Amino acid sequence: MSFLRTHLRWGVVALLFFTALLNNLDRMVLSVLAPTLKTDLAFGDVEYSYVVSAFLAAYAIGYTFCGKVLDRVGVKLGMMGALVFWSVAGMGHAAAVGWLSLAAFRFLLGLGESFNSPGGVKAVAEWIPRRERGLCMAVFSNGNVLGSIIAPPLVTFLLLHLGWRWAFVITGGLGIVLWAVWRHVYHSPERHPRLTDEERAVIMADRTGGSRRCATESADARQRVPPGIFALLRQPKCAGFFVARLLTDPIVYFFTFWLFSYLKEARNFSDMMIAAVGWIPFLASDVGGPGGGALSDWLVRRGWRPRSARLALMLFAACMMPVAILAVLTPNAWLAIACIALILGSQSCWMANQLTLISESVPRTHVATLLALSALGGSIGGIAANLLAGRAIHAAGYVPVFCALGFCHITAFTVLVLTGRKGVSNG
């Protein structure tokens, strides 16, 4: 307790972690229930891809304005509103009577959930000193991963004992509980009633670039940046983040929505086997994010420039991705599981450092807008990849899809290096 009294910022990180966990849990309910829903609501794989795309399309639309909303109303009001919205939408899935109504509720869920990542990154930028951001961003990001781990056993339990409609109601209702926690717990550092003067001084000193080592990058980040999301897109450095996530986020979406189908169709796993091992790759992701974030923070403390430290870990993660080719070609199903685990662990390392890099690239007041821009790219890439993957799998199986995703991160890393050579211009 004494640690929390003097390190209240870690309590904020814990709140962000559980918010991210619930965010992805609500998203994963559909993936776990998909076989049952296809039978009960009488639709097939093509319609299922449309339902998935409705969510991703709403995600993309939400990213065009959620950053601006968060920058204007603040983290607390923005996240509380989003929590209520996506929780009600999640519970609404229980009223679906066909794939069209399911897609409609899925669209609303995507709009609300689009606030989570920009809001979390903005909160980290407000509360966390730069030297700690890599680990904190990884902890926040891994809330999503834990949601993926919890979803299969929890949702299956609810399905077997209460039915699929109650599974949506109960998981969605958890958001209302979390809304109450946000209302009573979260405040900005300037206004938090339980923040010690010592910790407040540490947070505020970091905002002014108190470390000489970071002076140059802090000055660059404080340049005037056009606040509009599409104005940011005209800046090469910001456009680089957009393209990078357009190329790499589809890997997460692919395994989120198609992994269970791959294991059943290509590896002949039974439903019980999928329930028993389907969470393992996501557990690996839960290790890769904090590990990559902590290591980049260690490099910063050793004297590396923050940007160089984040990029070094991202390059390492990118070099792991071609193992996807081995995953799809090996006849050993368990080796395939191990390869997929390595892919998701590396993706988590990449994402943790990418989010940290974004938070350090523009003024604190515009972090959410830039994060929303980059995430918009991820959603657009996810929509395109989902539709293309469905057609490719139908025509040629999973081999071309796995081979393509093995090289997305190397391409994205090249884009980030080329577009990041200059700072953000003044407009």
Predicted segment positions?
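Extracytoplasmic
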Residues: 11-45, 116, 255-260
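Extracytoplasmic gate region of multi-pass secondary transporters
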Residues: 30-31, 233-292, 351, 355
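Helix-breaking motifs and short loop linkers at transmembrane-helix boundaries and internal kinks
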Residues: 42, 74, 95-101, 112, ...
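Central cavity-lining transmembrane alpha-helices of secondary-active solute carriers
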Residues: 53-68, 279-292
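Conserved MFS/SLC helix-loop-helix module at the cytosolic interface between two early adjacent transmembrane helices
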Residues: 61-100
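Structural signature of the two symmetry-related core transmembrane helices
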Residues: 77-91, 307-325, 406
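Cytoplasmic helix-loop-helix junction between adjacent transmembrane helices
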Residues: 105-144
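Helix-loop-helix hairpin linking two adjacent transmembrane segments in secondary transporters
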Residues: 140-193
